[in-house]
Design a protein with these regions (language model features):
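Catalytic Walker B motif of ABC-type/P-loop ATPase nucleotide-binding domains
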Residues: 83-87
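Conserved ABC ATPase signature
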Residues: 58-62
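Conserved catalytic loops of ABC-family nucleotide-binding domains
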Residues: 103-117
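Conserved ABC ATPase "signature" region
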Residues: 37-54
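Hydrophobic anchor residue at the start of the ABC signature
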Residues: 72, 100
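Conserved beta-strand-loop-alpha-helix hinge in the C-terminal portion
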Residues: 138-161
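Q-loop/switch helix immediately C-terminal to the Walker
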Residues: 8, 16-30
Length: 168
């Protein structure tokens, strides 16, 4: 089982639930997870992702950081072997991005993610060991984070220079 964190942050259905606790509980209930187990799962996830204080709030009342954290908590609710995340810190400022990344990478699950945030991949506390750079649907680099950032920076610069030359 793989948990998925969508770029849109949280599924639209979560906005229909009366609270974010209910939004996480409904899929668990649908899969016949016993009540006591559901409450333990939700309690643990909400504590880890600092969502306990807003558990009774509707998703629409959450700020962007809390919506990102909720998306990760939702992806983990069925205890997947790994998490696949598309831009898990997209649209967040540096402080919120760091909090979301810390929560994501500290949950003891393998994380595969797409990002344009080069600062994120080189932070030693996240222990990212391998980075793939994809360009035009092809892997063009496979290696260590620092080297990936250098490669990506050069790639973007060369594309910018080529585009600038095309306009001249």
């Amino acid at each position: 089982l793989v948990g998925r964190v969508r770029r849109e942050e949280i599924p639209n259905a979560y906005y229909k639930a009366a609270s974010i606790r209910e939004a996480i509980d409904l899929p668990l209930k649908k899969h016949k997870v016993p009540e006591s187990e559901r409450q333990a799962i939700i309690g643990n996830l909400f504590a880890h992702f600092d969502l306990t204080s807003v558990a009774r709030e509707p998703a629409s009342a959450l700020d962007s950081e809390k919506r990102h954290l909720l998306a990760i908590a939702a992806a983990l609710s069925f205890s997947p072997a790994a998490i696949v995340a598309d831009e898990p810190t997209k649209g967040l400022d540096e402080v919120a991005s760091a909090r979301v990344a810390k929560a994501l990478f500290s949950y003891d699950k393998q994380v595969v993610f797409a990002t344009h945030d080069t600062d994120l991949i080189v932070r030693p506390e996240y222990a990212i060991g391998r980075v793939l750079v994809v360009d035009d649907h092809r892997v063009v680099f496979d290696g260590a984070p620092r080297e990936a950032v250098d490669f990506y920076t050069d790639l973007v610069r060369s594309k910018y220079e080529a585009a600038k030359g095309d306009r001249a």
